[in-house]
Amino acid sequence: MADSSFDVVSKVDRQEVDNALNQAAKELSTRFDFRGTDTTIAWKGEEAIEIVSSTEERVKAAVDVFKEKLVRRDISMKAFDAGDPQPSGKTYKVNGTIKEGITSEQAKKITKIIRDEGPKGVKAQIQGDEIRVSSKKRDDLQTVISLLKQADLEVALQFVNYR
């Protein structure tokens, strides 16, 4: 019997992030407490999001609105990294980034968790920014998935290519 396997990846659906950003921008333009604060939220490059407002409290509230929209679109908070409010002239800015991919350090940590706490016979191989987990038994793979979901990792994980 052939081995069963799946891949552990950390990817974010850019369209869902864009939808969350547009929803947040619409809410910021219509909410009463943001009137007159010139609060904007927009993409800055491919992976960065810039939130600008006239006061530090309003920029923090705008970040909270954006995070709420991300959660509603089923995007993990681990995938969004918001910086601290920075004064920029008469306004305050927050630069946030969308984190994708598993670094080699995180991949080593994940494979160590699988090796130490997972069932016997399960193999984990690092392949670039993803990890291939294989085993003869599908039940062992299900155990590894639940183990990784319970682990406290600083990266949002998805499980794809389940064969």
Curated annotation (Swiss-Prot):
A cellular-component GO term for this protein: cytosol
UniProt function note: Nucleotide-binding protein.
Organism: Mycobacterium sp. (strain MCS)
Family: Belongs to the YajQ family.
Descriptive protein name: Nucleotide-binding protein Mmcs_0777
Gene3D superfamilies xrefs: 3.30.70.860, YajQ-like, domain 2
PANTHER family: UPF0234 PROTEIN YAJQ (PTHR30476:SF0)
Keyword Nucleotide-binding (UniProt): yes
GO MF annotation: an example: nucleotide binding
